[in-house]
Structures are given as C-alpha cells and as structure tokens.
C-alpha cells in the first residue's frame, strides 16, 4: 500500500525532510535551525504586526541556521521562507517573549547541536554585550558545547559594566 501524497502532505515532508528543524523565539531574537527540506537559495522574510518587513535576506548557504536579532519583545512576527519569485515555501507566526523582570538573566539551551545563548530582560540603556565561554568571546549561537563557565559582559550607555555568569551543566 502506497499512501497518496496529495492526501497525506506529511508523507511529502517525511520523504523530503522538514523545512524547519527548530524554531526558538527569545525576547529580541529568533533562532531558526533549517531542516533537510529547506531551500538554501531561499529568502527569509520577517514582518511585524503592522505588516512592515523588518528582515529580508538570503539564507546563508554555509550555515544550517539563521539568527534574526533586534526584534521587539512581546511582538508577533510573521516568518516566511520564500522562493526568489516570493512564492511561500514555509511560514509561521512567532511571538517573541515579553520582558518579565527587572533583572537581566543569562540563559543557554542546546538546540540541534548548537548552544543558543539568550540575554533576557535587558533594559533599554544597554549599549552592547559580549558573551564568553571559559573566557573566550563567542557568538550567541555556538557550535562548541564543551565549556564550563558562560559569562555575559553587559555595557550600559553610562559606561558601567555588569557581569552575568553561569556554570554549564552537562
């Protein structure tokens, strides 16, 4: 018995691979891990609640993930993977997390073989931050999962610096 792909769209997805393996929304960022079924020649489009396109860029063929930053907390975004003619290959609505407290938090999680680091509850007067793993500066998406101390150095507009640190549990 061969199921009819027209009746079972999941059959096609299972055969060809999923477009998106993981989708993680933070407060100000969105992490998308692309599956085997993703068209790496596609274009990522992110629009806000008013329909304004805030991100439009080609996928990075070198990486199997995309990180979208500088989003607004507590906002619903329409995320789509488009062909070059703007035909929709995949779409979803994602709401960024709301700011829930007054104190900055350092969070990490493992997503599809990557360490995803999130800085939550950052106030508006933050000018920059650096994330370090065992003293070495890293990106907030990191392939190296072998570390012990994760640190964030948050610099405020008045020049003050705050250090957040956590021990990585295996």
Question: Could you describe each region identified by the protein language model?
Answer:
Residues 68-75, 142-149:
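Surface-exposed, short loops/turns at beta-strand junctions within beta-sandwich domains
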Residues 6-37, 73, 90-115, 168-169:
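Pro/Thr/Ser/Gly-rich low-complexity, intrinsically disordered linker/stalk tracts
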Residues 78-82, 151-155:
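Extracellular recognition modules
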Residues 34-38, 121-123, 144:
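Non-cytosolic beta-sheet module surface loops
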Residues 1-5, 84-91, 156-165:
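Short, exposed coil/turn segments at beta-strand boundaries within extracellular/luminal domains
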Residues 56-62, 135-141:
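Short beta-strand segments within Ig-like beta-sandwich modules, predominantly Fibronectin type-III
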Residues 17, 29, 41-43, 76, ...:
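Exposed beta-strand and adjacent loop surfaces of beta-rich binding modules
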């Amino acid at each position: 018995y061969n199921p009819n792909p027209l009746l079972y769209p999941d059959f096609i997805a299972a055969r060809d691979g999923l477009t998106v393996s993981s989708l993680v929304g933070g407060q100000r960022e969105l992490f998308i891990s692309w599956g085997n079924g993703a068209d790496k020649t596609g274009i990522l489009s992110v629009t806000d609640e008013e329909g304004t396109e805030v991100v439009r860029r080609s996928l990075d063929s070198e990486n199997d993930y995309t990180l979208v930053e500088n989003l607004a907390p507590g906002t619903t975004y329409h995320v789509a993977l488009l062909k070059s003619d703007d035909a929709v290959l995949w779409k979803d609505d994602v709401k960024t997390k709301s700011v829930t407290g007054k104190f900055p938090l350092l969070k990490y999680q493992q997503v599809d073989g990557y360490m995803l680091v999130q800085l939550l509850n950052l106030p508006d007067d933050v000018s920059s931050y650096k994330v370090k793993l065992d003293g070495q500066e890293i990106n907030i998406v990191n392939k190296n999962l072998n570390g012990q101390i994760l640190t964030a150095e948050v610099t405020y507009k008045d020049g003050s610096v705050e250090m957040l640190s956590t021990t990585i549990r295996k």
